[in-house]
């Protein structure tokens, strides 16, 4: 059982206030929890209590936050949350994956609603990365408008047999990062994967 009495209040509060509310619903306590993996990776023991790490990539940390919200410009609803946000001389956005990369998931088809399809950021990302959506499939409303865009991994030059990476979440996070940073800011978006040595 995870002992929160030895964990600093700011870490506990981040998960209590996060959209997943993973402490109260018990998800955090699973050995397969990405959130728990994030805390284990970005905290250190000081005076018998877990605190946020103070250095990252050789630099002192100005700010670190778990469950960091990334509001996307012109998108309503609950914003996507990055597992960890770190501010040094650059901004680092970290998405943590534990068991997800070993799951046979349903991510092979990427469905995006009209609020994403019509968002200028989404269009810029498609153009910048030369993602060809000419052979895309759409779900149409009664007036013939595309209300849900369906993309596949092939649009991103990812092998169809690869079904364990959530490209929809990746696109939403990327849009959130672009919405919350300026072009001249130094930033990076990284993934932290759990490597099970028993799995090829």
Regions found by a protein language model. Name each.
Residues 185-200:
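Long, compositionally biased interface segments
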Residues 1-15, 25, 80-82, 100-102, ...:
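ER/Golgi luminal nucleotide-sugar-dependent glycosyltransferases, focusing on the catalytic module
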Residues 1-59, 65, 106:
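Nuclease catalytic cores
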Residues 60-89:
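Active-site metal-binding core of divalent-cation-utilizing nuclease and nuclease-like domains
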Residues 84-100, 173:
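Conserved catalytic cores of phosphodiester-cleaving nucleases, focusing on short active-site segments
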Residues 69-75, 98-101, 195-198:
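Short, solvent-exposed loop/turn segments at secondary-structure junctions
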Residues 105-188:
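Acidic, metal/cofactor-coordinating or nucleic-acid-engaging core segments within structured domains
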Residues 34-38, 79-83, 91-93, 165-167:
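Extracellular structured ligand-interaction cores
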């Amino acid at each position: 059982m995870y002992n929160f009495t030895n964990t600093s209040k700011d870490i506990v509060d981040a998960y209590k206030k996060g959209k997943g509310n993973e402490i109260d619903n018990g998800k955090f306590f699973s050995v397969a929890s990405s959130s728990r993996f994030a805390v284990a990776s970005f905290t250190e023991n000081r005076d018998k209590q877990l605190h946020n790490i103070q250095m990252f990539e050789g630099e002192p940390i100005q700010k670190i936050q778990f469950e960091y919200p990334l509001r996307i410009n012109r998108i309503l609803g609950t914003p996507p949350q990055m597992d960890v946000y770190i501010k040094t001389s650059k901004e680092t956005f970290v998405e943590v994956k534990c068991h997800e990369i070993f799951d046979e998931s349903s991510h092979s088809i990427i469905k995006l609603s009209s609020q994403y399809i019509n968002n200028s950021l989404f269009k810029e990302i498609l153009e910048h990365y030369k993602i060809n959506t000419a052979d895309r499939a759409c779900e149409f409303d009664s007036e013939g408008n595309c209300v849900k865009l369906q993309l596949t991994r092939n649009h991103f030059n990812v092998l169809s047999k690869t079904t364990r990476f959530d490209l929809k979440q990746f696109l939403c996070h990327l849009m959130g990062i672009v919405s919350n940073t300026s072009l001249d800011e130094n930033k990076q978006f990284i993934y932290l994967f759990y490597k099970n040595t028993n799995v090829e």
